[in-house]
């Protein structure tokens, strides 16, 4: 398109081959600029950003109050530090729950048996395992474990320990770690959940336990977690150390592996939120619905119409082959509302003098 427009403006006629040659010269040339809202490049205090690279305004808007680096970060990562300050909902939700209940979230036991059970069954919520909407687990609305994909992962693995949840977080955040890899190994009985690779640290620690040198184990882990496969000679060394073929094959398939510390942080927050779902349910749903309403994913007109209406709406959206992203996002909230009704809770009528402007408040033991 650019080449044809260029030729047309200049009244030139060239062969198809020349058009192709000119187009080849444009491949990879930047057309516009973008920005990562959480990406911050740190410049030493006694220097200016121009000492390292030119700067520009995002989308070439000179009136924008934001400046961005002209070069992509990887071209200067050896010289400058970049921070990715990503937003996260879970700490906000935990703060809300702490304020509503007076429970110190840091004192919630991470081995609470009833909380652990909801990752296998909905029984601690007073529900059966046969509801087609809720499914066989009780993790609707729990970060990390509330999507259809991760709930099925829980059904496949039947976790009973916190460590298994950390591994599952690694499976879901990695690339080519679960589907076509660990899932097949577990369901076929080739390996247990504990034996499979969930996070990058698992590889290094396993190889060291097999007697391989620390530095070599680290190098193999780094190569696999970046999606580069096994380094030269590593396969033979792993065979000699007694590493099974399925493990080596699993390493070859992985494109990206999540760090264990990151997975632990996510699962700790998820488990604490799950504790409130089991032991302080109304406060949990209040905080969850508020969070969804802030993302424009809570339609009060739909939610207040009762359990049967919500069930029909969920099935209606799920049966669509062309459901929009907004509708799919709405299903996430509707599932939590349906579960809320199934647990015997209900929404109180609006009261101009009692209601908060934005937040959901607990009225009594059922509302």
Regions found by a protein language model. Give the residues of each.
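Noncatalytic, beta-rich nucleic-acid-contacting surfaces in large DNA/RNA-processing enzymes
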Residues: 1-367
């Amino acid at each position: 398109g650019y080449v044809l427009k260029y030729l047309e403006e200049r009244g030139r006629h060239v062969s198809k081959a020349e058009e192709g040659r000119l187009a080849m010269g444009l491949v990879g040339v930047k057309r516009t600029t973008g920005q990562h809202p959480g990406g911050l490049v740190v410049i030493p205090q006694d220097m200016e950003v121009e000492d390292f690279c030119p700067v520009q305004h995002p989308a070439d808007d000179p009136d924008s109050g934001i400046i961005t680096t002209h070069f992509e970060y990887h071209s200067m990562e050896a010289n400058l530090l970049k921070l990715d300050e990503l937003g996260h909902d879970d700490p906000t939700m935990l703060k809300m729950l702490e304020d509503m209940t007076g429970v110190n979230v840091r004192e919630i036991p991470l081995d609470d048996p009833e909380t652990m059970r909801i990752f296998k069954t909905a029984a601690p919520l007073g529900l059966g395992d046969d509801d087609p909407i809720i499914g066989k687990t009780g993790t609707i609305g729990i970060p990390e474990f509330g999507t259809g994909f991760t709930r099925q992962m829980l059904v496949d693995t039947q976790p009973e320990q916190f460590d298994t949840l950390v591994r599952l977080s690694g499976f879901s955040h990695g690339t080519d770690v679960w589907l076509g890899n660990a899932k097949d190994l577990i369901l076929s009985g080739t390996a247990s959940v504990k034996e499979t690779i969930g996070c990058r640290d698992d590889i290094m620690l396993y190889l060291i336990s097999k007697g391989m040198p620390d530095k070599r184990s680290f190098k193999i882990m780094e190569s696999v977690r970046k999606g580069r496969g096994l380094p030269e000679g590593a396969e033979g060394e792993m065979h000699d150390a007694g590493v099974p073929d399925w493990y080596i094959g699993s390493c070859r398939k992985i494109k990206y592996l999540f760090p264990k510390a990151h997975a632990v942080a996510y699962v700790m927050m998820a488990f604490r939120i799950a504790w409130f779902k089991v032991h302080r349910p109304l406060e949990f749903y209040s905080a969850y619905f508020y969070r969804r309403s802030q993302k424009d994913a809570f339609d009060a007109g739909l939610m207040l119409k009762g359990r049967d209406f919500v069930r029909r709406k969920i099935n209606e959206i799920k049966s669509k082959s062309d459901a929009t992203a907004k509708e799919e996002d709405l299903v996430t909230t509707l599932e939590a509302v349906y579960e809320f009704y199934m647990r015997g809770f209900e929404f109180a009528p609006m009261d101009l003098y009692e209601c908060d402007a934005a937040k959901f408040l607990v009225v009594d033991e059922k509302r």
